[in-house]
Swiss-Prot record:
<feature type="binding site">
    <location>
        <position position="500"/>
    </location>
    <ligand>
        <name>substrate</name>
    </ligand>
</feature>
<feature type="binding site">
    <location>
        <position position="429"/>
    </location>
    <ligand>
        <name>NAD(+)</name>
    </ligand>
</feature>
<feature type="region of interest" description="Enoyl-CoA hydratase/isomerase">
    <location>
        <begin position="1"/>
        <end position="189"/>
    </location>
</feature>
<keyword id="KW-0413">Isomerase</keyword>
<dbReference type="Pfam" id="PF02737">
    <property type="entry name" value="3HCDH_N"/>
</dbReference>
<feature type="binding site">
    <location>
        <position position="296"/>
    </location>
    <ligand>
        <name>substrate</name>
    </ligand>
</feature>
<protein>
    <recommendedName>
        <fullName>Fatty acid oxidation complex subunit alpha</fullName>
        <ecNumber>4.2.1.17</ecNumber>
        <ecNumber>5.1.2.3</ecNumber>
        <ecNumber>5.3.3.8</ecNumber>
        <ecNumber>1.1.1.35</ecNumber>
    </recommendedName>
</protein>
<dbReference type="InterPro" id="IPR006180">
    <property type="entry name" value="3-OHacyl-CoA_DH_CS"/>
</dbReference>
<comment type="pathway">
    <text>Lipid metabolism; fatty acid beta-oxidation.</text>
</comment>
<dbReference type="GO" id="GO:0004165">
    <property type="term" value="F:delta(3)-delta(2)-enoyl-CoA isomerase activity"/>
</dbReference>
<feature type="binding site">
    <location>
        <begin position="400"/>
        <end position="402"/>
    </location>
    <ligand>
        <name>NAD(+)</name>
    </ligand>
</feature>
<feature type="binding site">
    <location>
        <position position="453"/>
    </location>
    <ligand>
        <name>NAD(+)</name>
    </ligand>
</feature>
<feature type="region of interest" description="Disordered">
    <location>
        <begin position="708"/>
        <end position="729"/>
    </location>
</feature>
<dbReference type="InterPro" id="IPR029045">
    <property type="entry name" value="ClpP/crotonase-like_dom_sf"/>
</dbReference>
<dbReference type="InterPro" id="IPR001753">
    <property type="entry name" value="Enoyl-CoA_hydra/iso"/>
</dbReference>
<keyword id="KW-0442">Lipid degradation</keyword>
<dbReference type="InterPro" id="IPR050136">
    <property type="entry name" value="FA_oxidation_alpha_subunit"/>
</dbReference>
Length: 729
């Protein structure tokens, strides 16, 4: 053994060839600060070996290196800029020394090589991969950019266009694409990986392969003509501006850095990467996006723990076809759980099957599946008008009309047709689960399972625990939701549960702004362009459906009369009374026409101003700051109340539900992350300016207490140790 660290070791293989093996405790390898330091020590040992002829890098895990240790990021990002810069210089010196070894090097890459894992293998001369490879640089999705030389080496290896596509979008690619663009030199079966890598290494040692020529372009300026450079970087900057926008500075920073570094050799280019990385790491956007990643891991880990002793349902059923029922049926079947889809009429069943077939055909058109796979999936969706086969069902989700009497009757009837251990769930969006459970003989086998539309796109499923729902019931539906590729978050029962309960105060803030004379067009523009929502409130109401929102608003008002009951007619009432139901009938706040692709395109409609004038004060202008404050304060206050009342368990789960269920702008990280970034004391000062607007603007007592000491909701993060300590971590 030449060297042994906690996460990697170095040993001789044969005749002057050494192997460096990543083998961290646990199931995956991560390129954390300790591993970077250990890698530097191992390379130091290699540099002393006069008889070294070649080096093989490999992993003892199912994945090569999944990336940097993101749990370290928040503390690393708190160290002063100069100190973070020093540590990056140290880390890059390690990869430079790997790249500069006086012998050929090869990485045998299996599974994932992401972020720092990808940057590590970019420093070797050759890369051989297995078919399950996923390789790329996802850093821009975390609000940063590659910091271990990825923005320098990848463009010089692949050319500017391919590298920019991966780096700016935070993409990873599979084995075939990696081979096509030159990111790997070959792909072999897993059992042949080491044998194949050794064969390439021997050829390089023997002079049959010119490894020095392979290495040289990575050390030099990027080979691009002036015209090529102008085209590549201009197109990339245009694409980034269109897709990422001003709220996500990392992608455009990465593109500009690669452009600026193109004319330099490795050392100067790495210095530019360092100078760009460090300021990004100190942005609120990076902290928020890293926070989302960590919260996502926490939520998934919680679901995994909850379901460890539960068998995933093998047969499901959906009550109610149509768009929602068809979407749930498709998602279940697509992920391998057969589903019976029951409705009371043929037309609805046909609509449900058409929805599922449409989604499968999109997969076919994109080349994700072939005709055989399509036929196989669709054959596992069984449409029916009766309860045939329900005795085999493990879980049933009801997705019928949002009417408590109808839901109770259908659920009670279904309970008599299934096994005593079958779980029943309702896809209701607002009706309390404990109320629906009153109609059942086995309420312990019942819970809520709130999907979001469109089902195939929206990652969140709210799992609602009723007063009598058993732990096993909750675990079974969490297991099914996870199997469907969704992110299940368990909440306790109340009107609207979590997501809709906090959404309707936001809509109430919108209605009050309109009542006071604000223009809905400006509100939409401010909330989209300035705050960052994917849709402004008027547009969102049109998509949800004005009729749906009108009904849900009444349910919420009955559930929380002290805050959500109103004594005036608002914009939603006015549009509902005028039969303007939004996108579904082409008229809402906006007027909708189909574009060339058959998708609804919104246009202005002067008629809506006359309707709104009946329920509004004369038009007046509001500042962007006031619009954002008046829209967000009711939502944030309600989010805090849900945490204080135990409706949602943690700030992490609340923020993920908002991001995944409502499209809360990820660069803010969720309501609690936004609140922490703003500071609870500053938030209280802002909210108190608007408390005259009513109970929705009154800050909950728990938040007031935090504001007295400006306490955050997330646990405070300590800065990482000084850079000298990090080097030897």
């Amino acid at each position: 053994m030449l060297y042994k660290g906690d996460t990697l070791y170095l040993d001789w293989l044969e005749d002057g060839i050494a192997e460096l093996v990543f083998d961290a405790p646990g199931s995956v390898n991560k390129l954390d600060t300790a591993t970077v330091a250990s890698l530097g020590e191992a390379i130091g040992v290699l540099e002393q070996q006069s008889d070294l002829k070649g080096l093989l890098l490999r992993s003892n895990k199912a994945a090569f290196i999944v990336g940097a240790d993101i749990t370290e990021f928040l503390s690393l990002f708190l160290v002063p800029e100069e100190q973070l810069s020093q540590w990056l210089h140290f880390a890059n010196s390690v990869f430079n020394r790997l790249e500069d070894l006086p012998v050929p090097t090869i990485a045998a890459v299996n599974g994932y090589a992401l972020g720092g894992g990808c940057e590590c293998v970019l420093a070797t001369d050759y890369r051989l991969a297995t078919p399950d490879l996923r390789i790329g640089l996802p850093e821009t999705k975390l609000g940063i950019m590659p910091g271990f030389g990825g923005s320098v080496r990848m463009p010089r290896m692949l050319g500017a266009d391919s590298a920019l596509e991966i780096i700016a979008a935070g993409k990873d690619v599979g084995a075939d694409q990696a081979l096509k663009i030159g990111l790997v030199d070959g792909v072999v079966k897993a059992e042949k990986l080491i044998e194949g890598a050794m064969a390439i290494l021997r050829q390089a040692i023997n002079g049959d392969l010119d490894w020095k020529a392979k290495r040289q372009p990575k050390l030099e300026p990027l080979k691009l003509s002036k015209i090529e450079a102008t085209m590549s970087f201009t197109i990339a900057k245009g694409m980034v501006a269109q897709t990422a926008g001003k709220h996500y500075p990392a992608p455009i920073t990465a593109v500009k850095t690669i452009e600026a570094a193109a004319r330099f050799g490795r050392e100067e280019a790495l210095n530019l990467e360092n100078k760009s990385f460090v300021p990004l790491a100190h942005t609120n956007e990076a902290r928020a996006l890293v926070g989302i990643f960590l919260n996502d891991q926490y939520v998934k880990g919680k679901a995994k723990k909850l379901t460890k002793d539960v068998e995933t349902p093998k047969q499901a059923a959906v009550l109610g076809a149509g768009i929602m029922g068809g979407g749930i049926a498709y998602q279940s079947a697509w992920k391998g759980v057969p589903v019976i889809m029951k409705d009371i009429n043929d037309k609805s069943l046909a609509l449900g099957m058409t929805e599922a077939a449409k989604l499968l055909n999109k997969q076919l058109e994109r080349g994700k599946i072939d005709g055989l796979k399509l036929a196989g999936v669709i054959s596992t969706i069984h449409p029916t008008l009766d309860y045939a086969g329900f005795e085999r069902v493990d879980v049933v989700v009801e997705a019928i009309v949002e009417n408590p009497k109808v839901k109770k009757a259908v659920l009670a009837e279904t309970e008599q047709k299934v096994r005593p251990d079958t779980v029943l769930a309702s896809n209701t969006s607002t009706i309390p689960i404990s109320e629906l459970a009153n109609a059942l003989e086995r309420p312990e086998n019942f819970c809520g399972m709130h999907f979001f539309n469109p089902v195939h796109r929206m990652p969140l499923v709210e799992i609602i625990r009723g007063e009598k729902s058993s732990d096993e019931t909750i675990a079974k539906v969490v297991a099914w939701a996870s199997k469907m590729g969704k992110t299940p978050i368990v909440v306790n029962d109340c009107p609207g549960f979590f997501v809709n309960r906090v959404l309707f105060p936001y809509f109430a803030g919108f209605s009050q702004l309109l009542r006071d004379g604000a223009d809905f067009r400006k509100i939409d523009k401010v909330m989209e362009k300035q705050f960052g929502w994917p849709m402004g409130p008027a547009y969102l109401l049109d998509v949800v459906g004005i009729d749906t929102a009108h009904h849900a608003q009444a349910v919420m008002a009955a559930g929380f009369p002290q805050r959500m009951q109103k004594d005036y007619r608002d914009a939603i009432d006015a549009l509902f009374d005028a039969n303007r139901f939004g996108q579904k009938n082409g008229l809402g706040f906006w007027h909708y026409k189909e574009d060339s692709k058959g998708k609804p395109k919104k246009e202005e409609d002067a008629a809506v101003d006359d309707l709104l004038a009946e329920v509004s004060q004369p038009k007046r202008d509001f500042s962007e700051e006031e619009i954002i404050a008046r829209m967000m304060i009711p939502m944030v206050n309600e989010v805090v109340r849900c945490l204080e009342e135990g409706i949602i368990a943690t700030p992490a789960e609340a923020d993920m539900a908002l991001v995944y269920g409502l499209g809360f702008p990820p660069f803010h990280g969720g309501a609690f992350r936004w609140l922490d970034t703003l500071g609870s004391a500053k938030y209280l000062d802002m909210a108190q300016q608007y408390q005259h607007l009513g109970p929705l603007y009154e800050v909950p007592e728990g938040l007031r207490n935090k504001a007295r000491h400006n306490e955050p909701y997330y646990p405070p993060v300590e800065p990482a140790r000084p850079v000298g300590d990090l080097k030897t971590a």
